[in-house]
């Protein structure tokens, strides 16, 4: 005769008064290995260097410290804290409604460009004043020159068409005593990017650019509204201005959008084929790559590459090209980077 079965204890119903904590999406650790912004932000350490950040720190739905990335003031102070803590920038501010870029992604572009130069230098990143970099459209934030000089001691020339942005960037450079390593220049002719900007005898090891990616203000506004919706901040009763996400018109859009800007940059770069070793630009839309490849062939670029980057769930890339042969690249290295 079989023994009676012991009944299984009934499962307890979950306490409806204590909802389960949301599981935070896992972020891929895909920043450049030399990028200083690996892992989560240490907010207590950031607040120690920049006390005004404290009032912007919140607890996100996953129970982690963060900031409200939809708040321009919070993002601006957060960037100030990052630049001070990681790059020694003591004074940094930008005018209201100007682009306030994410620092980790900007640092990635710098580090991958350093790898590009290392590929011409036996795997060693050239450092110091022997490297000159042109930042095309530096913006009011001047972030690329600040990071590039802090990390590699490179010298920079930042170009910009907006006089207000030039004045803001100059204030940052002067207040941090960086006048000798970061120079600024306004492009007076809005129809050109490089033509009319560079002076006779100037040579650059790199150019870099974060081009405007929208083709109209309407398109830029829609892009801003998508970001608001992604952050759960969209208000269907009120039309959100594009500048809520930061950025003047010249920073966000140009006629023809990113594809036209980049193809014009490529066409103009051919005029400076032996004044620059590597030209480069960010490309936000992968769909623009075929047109860019066509423009590179038309301009006569001898070598080009697409470098993919990833910051968490965001994918980005830059295109780099040169008009110099391998032997000319080695001559450039010997003349500029090899210490006599």
Swiss-Prot record:
Its EC number is 2.1.1.181. Specifically methylates the adenine in position 1618 of 23S rRNA. It catalyses: adenosine(1618) in 23S rRNA + S-adenosyl-L-methionine = N(6)-methyladenosine(1618) in 23S rRNA + S-adenosyl-L-homocysteine + H(+). GO terms for molecular function: 23S rRNA (adenine(1618)-N(6))-methyltransferase activity. Residues 1-36 are annotated as: Disordered. Keywords: Cytoplasm, Methyltransferase, rRNA processing, S-adenosyl-L-methionine, Transferase. One of its GO terms (biological process) is rRNA base methylation. This is Ribosomal RNA large subunit methyltransferase F. Transmembrane segments: none annotated. The gene is rlmF. GO terms for cellular component: cytoplasm. Pfam families: Methyltransf_10 (PF05971). It is found in: Cytoplasm. Belongs to the methyltransferase superfamily. METTL16/RlmF family. Gene3D superfamilies: Vaccinia Virus protein VP39. Its main location: cytoplasm. The keyword DNA-binding does not apply. InterPro entries: METTL16/RlmF, rRNA_lsu_MeTfrase_F, SAM-dependent_MTases_sf.
